[in-house]
Amino acid sequence: MQNTILIHAPGRRQGRGALVLAYTALFALLMGIWAAIFALNGQSFIQYGDTLKQHYPFLVYYGRWLRQAARCVLTGAAMPTWDFSIGYGADIITTLSYYGLGDPLDLLAAFVPGRWTEQLLEGLIVLRLYLAGLAFMAFSRRHGNSRFGTLLGALAYVFSAWPIQAGLIEPVFLVPMYCFPLMLLGADDLFEGRSPVLYIAAIALTALSNFLFFYMAAVLLVLYAIAVYSKRYGAKNLRTLPPLLAKFIGFALVGIAISAVTLLPTAQELFGSARFGLTRETAPYPFYRFFELLANMTTGMGYDAYSTYAGVTSATFLGVLVLFAKPRQNTVLKCAWLGLLALLLVPQAGSVLNGISYVSNRWVWAFTMLEAFILARVCPGITAFEPKEKRNLFALLAVYCVVAFCVKQGRTETALLGALLLVLLAVFVLAADGVSRRGVQAVLLAGCCLGVVMNLGGYYGIEEADAVNEYRPAGYAWSTTVQDNPAVTLHLMEDQSYWRYDSLVNEPINSPMLLDVYGTGYFFSLNNSYLSSLFRELGQNTPVEYDYRGLQNRTPLETLFGVKYALCAPDSTGALPALFDSQAVQAAEIGGSTVAVYPNTAALPIGYTAQNQISRETYDALTPLQKQDALLDGVVLEETGLLPEAELTGDTVSPAAEMELDGVQQLDETTYYAPQDGGRITLTIAQPVADCETAFVVQGMQYTATSPLDAMNEEELSAMSAHDRRSLQKQYAHFWRKDSVYLRLLSNIGEGRIEYNRPNSQYYCGRHDFVYNFGTSDEPLQQITIVLPFAGCYQFDRLAVECQKLDTVAARAENLGAENLQNVTLGTNSLGGEITTTRSSVLVVQLPYSTGWSVTVDGTPAQVLRADTAFLGVALEPGSHTVAFTYKTPGLTAGAALSAAGVVLLAAIWAVPALRKKSKKRRK
């Protein structure tokens, strides 16, 4: 049995309890060491980045939402699927499904108060890791691996680089670690002719928990099934393929149907998101990456921009070397390891397995599972070598050490320590002929545990990578997002109408959803595509469209988006947008600092009317600042002829500027070449415009990196010393891989920065137009210098300074808001109110458009219009009207029906065989 793989081995129940007990004890020990590292440094498992900004707010909110949903079920009320406090308003299911809205484990949030969600999040991380080990052991034992080998493999898998580096930052990344082994076990059941219940349940669990990892797991499951089928039947028994294929596909569809309640709505939203379907560039990996990857096989390190956390422990990688040292054994495993390693080295594979999106090896948990399985497989005979096999192992070890450390990127202290432990363990197994089985097991177990501790210390230790510094103390998450959040001040306001606020203080992103206030920030992976389009049209200086904070003090936008108040420190009122009153209407002491609330004197109400429309053709021809100006004169509609054409009365000018180049060559009308880092383009305005809001506008930006060495002639290179020449060559060896660039702006009224992500960046969202708002100042902008920090070709369709007079903004806003929605009620998935209009008009409601919205006017269904690219609209005739918008998640009804049907089918599949068996017994 040891010479085969992927063949079901029945009867492996012996010692199951002892194995689980041993695993539990060792897991507790190693997890305790992990936790102790954090405790000794005064930190929790809450990382300052994505954990605090996305996963923690999700879990707090989800617990509250579940409790509300339970009350709705008990009272017969409608369940909320739309929330006005998520960004500018968002669908709850599609926004949060990526973070575990369908994950059964996250249902525990319903029983935990928000204040204790931090502890729940930490507990779920530990629980998921523990379950990953149990799932791995079940799979390993099913395939005939020894108990001790399975134990070692489980520890190696659970404490590999993937959970160490990614599992705490993105807790949802741990989901496939326990779901995927269950999917493989279910597939084994189908091959063995057993019940498909586990297969269906595992697919449903994975798809419910996270749609992206379900996609990855499904692709890898197909590869696994091909390998198993080839091993079992080969090419000579293809007649068995159709019935097997029918079973695999049919039962998989049942599992997918069960998950459809979240999967179907999310898929519909995903296909329309800003990140989906973009044309991206996929650059080859640098040559040294192969060596760096090998060097870090024995560590918890090896960070790169592609999430390639492939490290395990020295003992585990020794298992891989032993596997290859023994010829004519475990051929399928060898092919699998080489195949997956090849995929890690091909960027296109990272793109395909990441949902045909940007390059990311987030499937690397499957590679570490394979390595852990290899360790479990070779463990029983790890000291039994033929002379030739010993020579093979020694040669492989030597080649590994030479290859892995031949480049500097691999010669880290942690990698060298991992290699040293690998060599020591290899020497032991080569010389352990006379050592007892218990002795060998003790050394291997100690080596495995020591490797885990070394990896934890190397990554989190303050003397090493010091990753623990990225985490925050216990209680920090609740304090910063809720208890001491500056937005708590808004709860003291007496204004009970619907309004948004902007923030000029340090407020955690996504925290408004925890306080039930309506902000202007958002950071979740899926976002409203129409809102993204509007921001793109307006040139918002946010290169990542699903991560935005505020409206960058652009006065017309603050008005158009209904921002009625701003949070600001009393000593920083000079930073307020132009039409905000400097007299605070509310103030409070929050977290040791004073926070005040300042009103916008020109904010539009949530529902206002436009009597004129701007055609899409006219609107698209405007510059970003002209667009925001035009929206104060009418409404942009996709339909034509509903309203008279608007007369654009705004006053946005672009003063003529003289361009001066320093270290930059203009190749053509739009292309500028900076041969060296730090080139400058200076625009000098002969007739500056005063008393306005001033912005710098970039349109059609693109960037192609070049090496500064290419611009140096032979004479310049020869004048340099050999050392300096090699240093420059090394510095710019991978210039072509640059995936982002920024423009540094220097002017007489302030400094700024515009960031641009190239198509080869994982953060690329198709943005090429940007506006940097300098705001208003006592003096006009006279000169601005654009610093090009890196050598390369910069393409700008347009570089300009634009100045917008604000004299008429308040009056035009007052005209739009003269006939507005009154007695506004925000209900569950609904917004309604009353309005009286004197002319034919379009009611614009500042909520993101979605096909899930419907509207009635005076009880009669009407067409929901897409207004101003991203908002809701409805046409109204003169008179008094009652308007009611209602939201239903697109695809939710169909998804729920499919889920119900899937559950019924699963129950039937489970029950029918049992009933038949019972019936047969009765007949006998």
Predicted regions and their residues:
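Contiguous transmembrane helix-bundle modules in multi-pass membrane proteins
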Residues: 194, 213, 335-348, 352-481, ...
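Active-site-proximal, structured, solvent-exposed surfaces of multi-pass membrane proteins
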Residues: 7, 11-13, 654-924
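Extracytoplasmic/lumenal acceptor-recognition loop(s) of multi-pass membrane glycoenzymes
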Residues: 86-88, 94-98, 450-476, 490-561, ...
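A cross-kingdom signal targeting lumenal/periplasmic-facing segments of multi-pass membrane
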Residues: 105-109, 517-629, 633-663, 692, ...
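Membrane-embedded helix bundles of polyisoprenyl
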Residues: 27, 129-143, 147-232, 244-267, ...
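Membrane-interface coil-to-helix junctions
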Residues: 30-133, 155-177, 270-275, 282-309, ...
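Start-transfer (signal-anchor) and selected internal transmembrane alpha helices
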Residues: 1-38, 243, 247, 430-446, ...
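Periplasmic/ER-lumenal interhelical loops and adjacent helix-loop junctions
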Residues: 53-54, 60-72, 97, 104, ...
